[in-house]
Amino acid sequence: KNILSKFDIPKINVIRNENDLYYRNKIELKIVDGKLGFYEKNTHNLIEIKECKVTKKSINKSFEFVKNMKLENANVTIRANYNDEVLIIIDSKEKPVILNPEDYKIVGIVLNDKCIYGQDNFMEKINNLFFTVSYNSFFQVNNYINLELFNLIKENIVGKTVLDLYSGVGTLSIVASKVVDKVYSIEVIPNAVKNALINAKINKCDNINFILGKVED
């Protein structure tokens, strides 16, 4: 039954993802008793995985590296950028073994919010724009849809003042700043705001006011 049929809602065109496989630039995993995987829905039963078909191949390749860290129990987040460089973020009481990270293009490892190898950020690129992304900063997980979103923004907000709420590293703020007079960008995570200020400078944007704080305030 279509419960929305009584409402006069215009047709919405859904933008299809160009690639159905190997497109996500981030994954969050569990390590339980030395095994890497996801929790089964509504349980704490671990489903061990060897591959995740919706995340980038560079992330899948790094699974081997993560398993070789010899961790028994941990939360692990893996992020990869346009150049297939990889950041690994670990929450664990154990110290990981680090073996041949260069073979997997690992540029940084963060353990309990402390960088223990390489750097705690990397550079992301979409179209002709560059973005510094810290290990705990929000960045959209689908770069293809990001590009489509950028184009949609440019087409619909020319000449206006824009509020970018929960703005992360300033991705949408920077895109909007190219076609509007002023952007107010609000984000609660300090690292993300720090990234956003750098990103505005990299992309030569001087009409964005970055605000550190809660949107609700």
Model-derived features: positions:
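Nucleotide donor/acceptor-binding cores
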Residues: N25, V86, G159-K160
